[in-house]
């Protein structure tokens, strides 16, 4: 599964093992992939002033323990996530309701986690 920036930030905010919650919902282990462009977005956030910078640094630490998906892509992250998901056949995991709606509109399978830690598998 391909993790987006909002999901990695949510891992920090929630303080919970949301990956295990997703595995319980799916009934099988998952293999999280973090695209290099998501890491780039987190690095940009970590370098800025404000409350998000600390969360972004912590999200980068979490992401460092996962497999990086090297794409060499640049540009608008959400659109690149759509392309990656369609090319690889992996769902995108997000807590961003706007992205979730866009993914569904584009025919991309996604796993949406809301703030109450409810997991929805959507196609």
Which residues make up each language-model segment?
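Residues that recognize and position ribonucleotide moieties
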Residues: 1, 32, 111
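Metal-dependent nucleic-acid phosphoesterase active-site entry motif
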Residues: 1-14
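Signal for well-folded cores of large energy- and translation-related assemblies
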Residues: 13, 23-27, 86, 104
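Charged helix-capping and loop-helix junction motifs
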Residues: 15-19
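PIN/NYN-family metal-dependent endoribonuclease catalytic core
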Residues: 21-47
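Nuclease catalytic cores that cleave nucleic-acid phosphodiester bonds
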Residues: 37-123
């Amino acid at each position: 599964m391909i993790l987006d920036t909002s999901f990695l930030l949510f891992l920090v905010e929630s303080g919970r093992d949301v990956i295990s919650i997703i595995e319980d919902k799916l009934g099988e282990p998952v293999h999280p992939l973090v695209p290099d462009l998501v890491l780039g977005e987190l690095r940009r956030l970590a370098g800025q002033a404000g409350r998000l910078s600390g969360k972004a640094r912590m999200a980068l630490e979490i992401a460092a323990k996962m497999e990086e998906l090297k794409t060499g892509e640049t540009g608008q992250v959400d659109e690149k996530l759509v392309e990656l998901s369609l090319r690889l056949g992996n769902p995108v995991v997000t807590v961003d309701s706007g992205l979730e709606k866009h993914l569904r509109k584009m025919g991309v399978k996604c796993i949406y986690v809301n703030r109450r830690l409810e997991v929805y598998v959507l196609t």
